[in-house]
Structure formats: C-alpha cells, structure tokens
Amino acid sequence: MAIDEERPPGPRLALRGISKRFGAAQALAGVDLEVYPAEVVALVGDNGAGKSTLVKIIAGIFPPDIGEMRFAGEEIRLRGPKDASAFGIATVYQDLALCDNLDVVSNLFLGKEEVRFPRLMDEEAMERHALEVLATLNVSLPSVRVPIAALSGGQRQSVAVARAILGSAQLVLMDEPTAALGVAQTKQVLELIVRLREQGLSVVVISHNLADVFQVADRIVVLRLGQLAGNLWTRETTREEVVARITGADEGKVKAAE
C-alpha cells in the first residue's frame, strides 16, 4: 500500500532537498521529510547518519545549506530556536535540560513566568496551569511542588514534554526519549507519545530502540550516511528490513525511499 493513500491532505511539516555540510563532512544530502498532524514519525539510522543534524535544522539550531522547509503549507526560514517555537515546534532533548533543584512548576515556567501586577510572579496561576497541562497528558506526579531531583526518569521525561507543549506546540521533536530508562518508565514515556498523537500533535522521535519504534511510530524514516534510505509504514515493514536499510545491507533499496 502506498503511503500517500492514507495521508490527510497537507503535511504539517515538509522538508525538501535539505542538505547540510560541516567543513568537509556532508551531514545531509538532499533529504525530504513530511510529518502529518496526529502522526508519530520515528527517525532512525546508525551513528553519524544525520538524524541529530536534521532535527536541529527543524528546531532552528542549524540553518540548512540548501533546501526548503514548510510548516502548515507556509515556507519558513528559521533564524533560531525562538523562531521554531513561534511556529509551534517544540524540542525535548535527551538531557531534558531540567533544573534538579527547582520544583515542577518552576521548571515548566522557567523563563516564561506568569506575572500579575505589579510584576510579581503569579504562583497560583502557574500551579493551576501546570496541573492542567499535566492532566491533559495523564501524567501522575506526587506533587507539582516537589524538586525535579525527587522524580523518576519517566516522570522527569513527562515534565520535559509538558514544558515543551506548554503554549501552542503543534510538532514535538524528541531525542532518544527512552534512553537509560527502565521497563516501567519506558512504558510510561511511550504512552505519553501516544497521548500526544491522540491530541492531534505531530511527533518526531529519534531512537535506536526499534522495539520502542515499532510500538508507537506510524512511519519509520531511515537515514544512512546523510541520505534518505527508507520511508516505511511501521505496520507493513519488519525489523529486518529496517536494519537492512540502516546498514545498507539491501543496497538495491537504499536509494528507493518509498
């Protein structure tokens, strides 16, 4: 079955011919990518395949050397992460960038504190909004006033995601969201990704864990040596085929991205 047969009209994010070079190293070469509303796309590939570079371009950290980027049908040029955030692109990095000594509310609103006259932080409003966004994700915490250091890995990941979508996020980028997590915590994070999709958000997940990928992703996009090596419906492919695309074992299909 062709992938286009079940896609809704118009991708939320569309990249065309994205290339990026760092000195003599060609990180990306002519990569196309589309992500639709209410879709989870897994970005997989070996180390050095270009996954992180592609996500950093989407997040506004790096500008592409060549290529076009469209969001909701509009061509955009991102001059930095603030531009990406303004378009509704949120990023959850592998290190989460949380402050262990601050509580959940303070982490959620760090740098974007809600204030009331005369320029005083509105602690009650922030706590109320924190509880609301965590409830939409079905995240259970002992309290929103406990320090981040007191939370489990899965709970910390949930707080990082809640912070990312606080506001008007439409696309969430997640870098290795289940890395170094135990079984129960991994299950919690995967359920969180599914809930993001159910709420209509688009999610791009970088992962080396194919078991997690096959559990939550609608599509799997494979990069190899900076080039697109596969664009596969999860339900219609196998781990063996994905690994073959990642490693180049099936060279006849490496350039035949569906």
Tell me the role of every PLM-derived stretch:
Residues 2-258:
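Glycine-rich phosphate-binding loops of nucleotide-dependent enzymes
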